[in-house]
């Protein structure tokens, strides 16, 4: 199986949802639902409303993503 190319985009957290899900507005204006990656969860990095984050999207479903980095 070939690993697909993931799309990385920057966005701002708009809302916190249950089960460590977040509503994120991307730079291009789209709003997606994103969950936290395992490394962020393992290191107890806190993500709050208004934080700038880097989101990874798959080409298969552009409405869901994974938060892989929180900017300072």
From Swiss-Prot:
Its main location: cytoplasm. GO terms for cellular component: cytosol. CDD domains: S1_IF1. It is found in: Cytoplasm. Gene3D superfamilies: Nucleic acid-binding proteins (2.40.50.140). The keyword Cytoplasm applies. Residues 1-72 form the S1-like domain. GO terms for molecular function: ribosome binding; rRNA binding; translation initiation factor activity. Keywords: Cytoplasm, Initiation factor, Protein biosynthesis, RNA-binding, rRNA-binding. The keyword Glycosyltransferase does not apply. One of the essential components for the initiation of protein synthesis. Stabilizes the binding of IF-2 and IF-3 on the 30S subunit to which N-formylmethionyl-tRNA(fMet) subsequently binds. Helps modulate mRNA selection, yielding the 30S pre-initiation complex (PIC). Upon addition of the 50S ribosomal subunit IF-1, IF-2 and IF-3 are released leaving the mature 70S translation initiation complex. Component of the 30S ribosomal translation pre-initiation complex which assembles on the 30S ribosome in the order IF-2 and IF-3, IF-1 and N-formylmethionyl-tRNA(fMet); mRNA recruitment can occur at any time during PIC assembly. Belongs to the IF-1 family. This is Translation initiation factor IF-1.
